[in-house]
Amino acid sequence: MAPNIRKNHPLLKMINSSLIDLPTPSNISAWWNFGSLLGICLLTQILTGLLLAAHYTADTTLAFSSVAHTCRNVQYGWLLRNLHANGASFFFICIYLHIGRGFYYGSYLFQETWNTGVVLLLTLMATAFVGYVLPWGQMSFWGATVITNLFSAVPYIGQTLVEWAWGGFSVDNPTLTRFFALHFLLPFMIAGLTLIHLTFLHESGSNNPLGIMSNSDKIPFHPYFSLKDILGFMIMLLLLTTLALFHPNLLSDPKNFTPANPLVTPSHIKPEWYFLFAYAILRSIPNKLGGVLALAASVLILFLIPFLHKSKQRALTFRPLSQLLFWLLVSNLFILTWIGSQPVEHPFIIIGQLASTTYFTIILVLFPITSALENKMLNY
């Protein structure tokens, strides 16, 4: 029998074992589509970003006008910019749903896969932040000023750290230049981390909606899930192009269409929608260092999730009390996102403080207690 090149070629056999002959649980639902959708998001962002970078000038006097020039004079430059800006939103929608799926079905018990995923989230957040500064509009400039200033809360070395990040005594040309360099570099770092993430995932195989061992019922990835993924790509790309063509500025801040002016502070500085939950937690503590620690904890808490798992069952599929808590947490995150977009005044301050407290309480206290209670209920 002739050797099968797909299974014997050094490169093709890696692709084969990851995308073609990969044994996959037969019952995984559409919630398992978001991993591949994130891959498509990354690819789209790198392609549109590369083409935008060809027309961008990383200089404070030219950055804003170079973006305007791209939109007005470059063939389909407006489309590239709209796809890239809204592609970032879709990236975050997909990653939040992907994390939510992992949380709901207990996928975090694949600890290496989960931890590399959290590192990927942090890298994505850093990439989005430095990218938002590049158009050099009002919100770009003041967002960069406010967020980089948070490093000054670090005891003893804080101020030095901020000036080192800025490359001077304020956000200026050196800051923009280095942010552009970082924004170009980080997506490739994300691509590398994704390969590590997949390597760890394929060591254990995918989890499934029942949260039980599925070795006795696996099917090949291709054609079953490759087709399912392609359907996902089509739906997501349709939604992305619809947003980019019909409502390109729906999710962006109008203040960013004004060139950066260090002498005029916007009345209400806020980041893009995907950072608002963390921004609300940061603002809910009336102390700089405390706020920064809470901000860091709001994302880094994900590293603790595997250690807080006390249930005898893996997924939440058959755990109604924990399901209730999960949806409370989701609702709470929506409230935090809304609060982050509001000015710092009554009643938003107290709502933000309550929602921030609830966020940490649900994850650190209520989930483990409820799991223990459900374990007890299994005995009756």
From Swiss-Prot:
Its main location: mitochondrion. It comes from the Eukaryota. Gene3D superfamilies: Cytochrome Bc1 Complex, Chain C. Heme b b562 binds at H84, H183. The chain crosses the membrane at residues 34-54, 78-99, 114-134, 179-199, 227-247, 289-309, 321-341, 348-368. Binds 2 heme b groups non-covalently. One of its GO terms (cellular component) is mitochondrial inner membrane. GO terms for biological process: mitochondrial electron transport, ubiquinol to cytochrome c. Heme b b566 binds at H98, H197. Pfam families: Cytochrom_B_C (PF00032), Cytochrome_B (PF00033). It is a multi-pass membrane protein. The keyword Secreted does not apply. A ubiquinone binds at H202. Signal peptide: none annotated. It is found in: Mitochondrion inner membrane. InterPro entries: Cyt_b/b6_C, Cyt_b/b6_C_sf, Cyt_b/b6_N, Cytb/b6-like_sf, Cytochrome_b, Cytochrome_b_C_euk/bac, Cytochrome_b_N_euk/bac, Di-haem_cyt_TM. The keyword Transmembrane helix applies. Belongs to the cytochrome b family. PANTHER family: CYTOCHROME B. Heme 1 (or BL or b562) is low-potential and absorbs at about 562 nm, and heme 2 (or BH or b566) is high-potential and absorbs at about 566 nm. The cytochrome bc1 complex contains 11 subunits: 3 respiratory subunits (MT-CYB, CYC1 and UQCRFS1), 2 core proteins (UQCRC1 and UQCRC2) and 6 low-molecular weight proteins (UQCRH/QCR6, UQCRB/QCR7, UQCRQ/QCR8, UQCR10/QCR9, UQCR11/QCR10 and a cleavage product of UQCRFS1). This cytochrome bc1 complex then forms a dimer. This is Cytochrome b. It comes from Trogon curucui (Blue-crowned trogon). The gene is MT-CYB.
